[in-house]
């Protein structure tokens, strides 16, 4: 049964690297390192991704398997090797621990860096030659052999990504006669030329006069005035779309025109060589399906707005613009960030400048400083991260390290306590949060994955943080920190029983039919992967609350209120948890595919979703109400995981599975996906299982000690594919787009 939303993968497929990375290899050739995820895989629990996180997932799987492998004589050599790999991965994790937490580079494809070059040229009409050289080095390192740039490593060229890279390289002074741009130009023209650009690329190009603003769907500023309870309002958009759309309302009103190196032109010929017909520059206005009544209505509405001049002369326009500016300023963090991601930072600054702000004004200066914190430069060149994930990296690493054997002494390591204290300090307690629009009365207590993003905590990070605290000290089950986080999580549950990433009931999927949305990523509905991690968190907490209360050594540090932990309080929280899980499990039953898998929106794809759901369901497999169904579902899921195991013992799955579900579980083995698969299988099978043994063998054999910057006692894993998806950057494209 199809219970997940099928949208094409988003272009920001993230990889993380240690800032100490001295490798000269490209992401295309596999320089991403796996710590957290693989660590967790060698011991057992789900993770996201970083140069940190992949190793941890593998490490954790090792420990879950070695605990049972010891009973089998034939497995002892593998057990010893797994423990050695675990020790090396743990050492590597400590190598990259800094300032009480972990944070690796989040690397995307080239679009976010290209758009940063556009942004800098808009502001200054100049790119520093030294800086431009670093950007050029990075962009060219990501170019495919056919001259294109893809939405992820090892994927075919994408015309919009390639067009943005071509323009960025031209802006920083690269000649059209260069062999790199010749090959890029050849690819773009062969793919249909600039007529095939996606909508967001058109917006950037319209700002330079490369395409007319009439080729952009109408975005009337009055959209900000639509009440939140209407079916269409800014709050019906996903958080990542909302934070981009509000400043775009201002930009679309002004329809700015900025110069390029050849000057200011309303019809700029700067990229005429990329058009098949530069005399007419045809731009189809969208691909709305005329047989779809919703898409047809949106198209007619857009044409009517265009006929009316986009309501620019409306008497409400001045008020709407002021409301947009007010919203932008209100949502700017004290540190200058917007939503913790780069696209709304670029758009927010441009919108404020168009409304009369100056470069020296405080909101602009803070925003520019925030953007600069996202830059990353090393011997591979300079690029811009779309976002950063220190909370995510840290809580997953904490949990993975704590699943290591007692002989390593991790639980007693003071650095773990420091990391937990750092995490506690980053719990959200303030009045901010767009989630309050629809859920104003639930307690605050979530976490965001970035340093500065008080407006958008997310359920996935919050559940992962709670799991880290519970794993470290079971007594935190009765802490205020955990209680508030769990009450916030439960309060964000959707009517269908599942959880989304950031929002409540953000499921108006018809919004993906608007002409502006050619990436189908405007909503944040329930997904099995987030729901799986959430019930894992709730299931672990439920089990701990059913045990006798224990005194936590660090109770005051984590905010234990006086009198907390009594039987009545425990019973009340247990009732809330049981009610939420009784709604979530039927959602997961409905969303299991016929193959036995679950869809994963936030990482690739069915391997990831299936792992997270299995890790959650394991806490309920003896529940009298759901036990038979859960056990049957888990058996089908594990059977599928074993069926798709690669001949080398690992697991892999490509981004193509989002477009073509028959590709589920198909792809070259990666450390992260191998770790995820092992974590899922280990919820049903023991370490002596042949698939588990083969998977652990693959991880042990692929560990790479050359990744360490130390004396040889540390090692990690190289990830050659992008295995997570990130709809936070609105530069999304379709796999194999026309």
Curated annotation (Swiss-Prot):
UniProt family annotation: Belongs to the terpene cyclase/mutase family.
NCBIfam families referenced in this protein's UniProt entry, alphabetically: squalene_cyclas
Taxonomic superkingdom: Eukaryota
GO biological process: triterpenoid biosynthetic process
Segments annotated as PFTB repeats: 132-173, 321-361, 482-523, 581-621, 634-675
Site (described: Transition state stabilizer): 392, 449, 602
Taxonomic source organism: Aspergillus fumigatus (strain CBS 144.89 / FGSC A1163 / CEA10)
Chain's role: Squalene hopane cyclase; part of the gene cluster that mediates the biosynthesis fumihopaside A, a hopane-type glucoside that enhances the thermotolerance and UV resistance of N.fumigata. The first step of fumihopaside A biosynthesis is performed by the squalene hopane cyclase afumA that catalyzes the cyclization of 3S-oxidosqualene into the hopene 21-beta-H-hopane-3-beta,22-diol.
EC supergroup of this enzyme: isomerase
GO cellular component terms listed in the entry, alphabetical order: lipid droplet
Metabolic or biological pathway: Secondary metabolite biosynthesis
GO terms of molecular function: intramolecular transferase activity
This protein's UniProt keywords: Isomerase, Repeat
Matches recorded under Pfam families: SQHop_cyclase_C (PF13243), SQHop_cyclase_N (PF13249)
InterPro entries: SQ_cyclase_C, SQ_cyclase_N, Squalene_cyclase, Terpenoid_cyclase/PrenylTrfase
Gene name as annotated: afumA
Name assigned to this protein: Squalene hopane cyclase afumA
């Amino acid at each position: 049964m199809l219970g997940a939303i099928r949208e094409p993968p988003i272009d920001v497929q993230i990889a993380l690297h240690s800032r100490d990375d001295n490798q000269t290899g490209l992401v295309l050739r596999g320089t991403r390192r796996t710590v957290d995820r693989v660590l967790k895989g060698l011991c057992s629990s789900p993770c996201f991704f970083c140069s940190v996180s992949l190793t941890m997932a593998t490490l954790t799987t090792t420990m879950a398997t070695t605990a049972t492998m010891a009973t089998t004589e034939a497995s002892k050599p593998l057990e010893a090797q797994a423990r050695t790999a675990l020790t090396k991965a743990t050492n590597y994790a400590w190598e990259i621990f800094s300032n009480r937490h972990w944070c690796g580079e989040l690397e995307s494809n080239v679009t976010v860096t290209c758009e940063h070059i556009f942004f800098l040229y808009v502001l200054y009409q100049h790119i520093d030659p030294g800086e431009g050289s670093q950007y050029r080095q990075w962009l060219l390192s990501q170019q495919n052999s056919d001259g294109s740039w893809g939405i992820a490593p090892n994927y075919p060229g994408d015309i919009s990504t390639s067009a943005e890279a071509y323009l960025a390289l031209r802006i920083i002074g690269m000649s059209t006669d260069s062999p790199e741009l010749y090959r890029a130009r050849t690819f773009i023209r062969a793919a249909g030329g600039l007529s095939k650009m996606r909508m967001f690329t058109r917006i950037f190009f319209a700002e330079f006069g490369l395409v007319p603003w009439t080729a952009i769907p109408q975005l009337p500023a009055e959209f900000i005035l639509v009440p939140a309870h209407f079916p269409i309002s800014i709050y019906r958009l996903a958080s990542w779309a909302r934070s981009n759309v509000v400043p775009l309302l201002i930009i679309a009103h002004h329809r700015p025109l900025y110069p390029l190196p050849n000057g200011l032109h309303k019809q700029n010929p700067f990229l005429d060589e990329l058009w098949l017909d530069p005399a007419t520059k045809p731009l189809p206005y969208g691909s709305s399906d005329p047989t779809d009544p919703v898409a047809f209505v949106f198209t007619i509405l857009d044409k009517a707005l265009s006929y009316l001049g986009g309501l620019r002369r409306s008497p409400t326009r001045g008020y709407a613009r002021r409301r947009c500016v007010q919203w932008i300023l209100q949502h700017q963090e004290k540190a200058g960030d917007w939503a913790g991601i780069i696209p709304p930072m670029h758009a927010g600054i441009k919108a404020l400048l168009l409304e009369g702000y100056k470069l020296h004004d405080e909101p602009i200066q803070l925003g520019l400083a925030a953007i600069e914190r996202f830059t990353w430069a090393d011997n591979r060149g300079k690029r811009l991260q779309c976002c950063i994930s220190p909370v995510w990296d840290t809580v997953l690493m904490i949990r993975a390290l704590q699943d290591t054997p007692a002989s390593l002494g991790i639980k007693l390591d003071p650095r773990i306590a420091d990391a937990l204290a750092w995490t506690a300090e980053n719990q959200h307690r303030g009045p901010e949060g767009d989630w309050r629009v629809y859920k104003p009365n639930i307690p605050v207590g979530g976490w965001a994955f970035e340093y500065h993003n008080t407006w958008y905590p997310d359920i996935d990070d919050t559940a992962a943080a709670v799991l880290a605290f519970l794993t470290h000290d079971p007594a935190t089950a009765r802490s205020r920190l955990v209680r508030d986080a769990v009450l916030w999580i439960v309060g964000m549950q959707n009517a269908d029983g599942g959880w989304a990433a950031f929002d409540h009931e953000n499921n108006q999927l018809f919004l993906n039919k608007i002409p502006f949305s050619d990436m189908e990523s405007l909503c944040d509905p329930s997904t099995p992967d987030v729901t799986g991690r959430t019930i894992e968190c709730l299931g672990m907490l439920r089990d701990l609350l059913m045990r006798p209360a224990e005194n936590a050594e660090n109770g005051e540090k984590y905010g234990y209120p006086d009198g907390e932990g009594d039987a009545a309080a425990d019973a009340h929280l247990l009732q809330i948890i049981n009610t939420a899980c009784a709604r979530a499990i039927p959602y997961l039953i409905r969303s299991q595919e016929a193959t036995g898998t679950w869809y994963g929106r936030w990482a690739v794809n069915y391997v990831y979703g299936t792992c997270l759901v299995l890790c959650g369901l394991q806490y309920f497999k003896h529940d009298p109400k759901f036990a038979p169904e859960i056990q049957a579902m888990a058996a089908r899921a594990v059977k599928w995981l074993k069926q798709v195991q690669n001949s080398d013992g690992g697991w892999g799955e490509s981004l193509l599975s989002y477009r073509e579900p028959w590709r589920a579980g198909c792809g070259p083995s990666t450390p992260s996906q191998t770790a995820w698969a092992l974590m899922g299988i280990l919820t049903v099978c023991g370490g002596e299982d042949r698939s588990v043994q083969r998977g652990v063998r693959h991880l042990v054999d692929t560990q790479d000690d050359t990744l360490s910057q130390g004396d040889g006692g540390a090692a990690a894993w190289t990830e050659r594919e992008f295995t997570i998806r990130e709809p936070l950057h609105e530069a999304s494209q379709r796999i194999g787009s026309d």
